[in-house]
Amino acid sequence: MNEYEEGLKLLEEKFGCGKDNAISLATIAREPNAEGKPRPVVRTVDAYYEDTVFYVTTHGKSNKIQQIAENQEVSIATSPEMFTASGIGENLGWVLDPKNVELRTKLRQVFAQWYDMANNEKDENCCILAIRLTRGTLNINHWEKLYHMDFVNKTTMENGGVF
């Protein structure tokens, strides 16, 4: 097993296996700051992880979805697992869309304790956000071992990753 595969295995152990993960999700605000420069916006979301993608249920008119519609570049961070990553956000559409049936079933299971309270599936704006990781750094035991992963090219990055 190479280092990239080792890192993927650790990500699956930490975030996969049907876990409800609290992650910080950063997007770019639609309105620039006073100097006309982009402003980051961050919030905590519950996410399901599978095969280098985090999935979130949300509302199609939420700020995060509107921001991602204008700029798909996102970043995430977790604690205490110490994983930071960049990725591409994509609105997969209404949770009841037939193309989402398998994923919706998984999300309902993972988020069972609160899913129905937080989501109105009859509202066509109740949607699934996919965060497709592009690169990231998994920090094991406070800098004992760093896995700098390029998820697009499926390799490790020699010159550092995302901190």
Segments predicted by a language model, with ranges:
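Residue-level marker for the onset of beta-strands and adjacent loop->beta junctions
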Residues: N21, R43, Q72, N125-C127
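A short mixed-secondary-structure module that forms the rim of ligand-binding clefts
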Residues: A47-M82
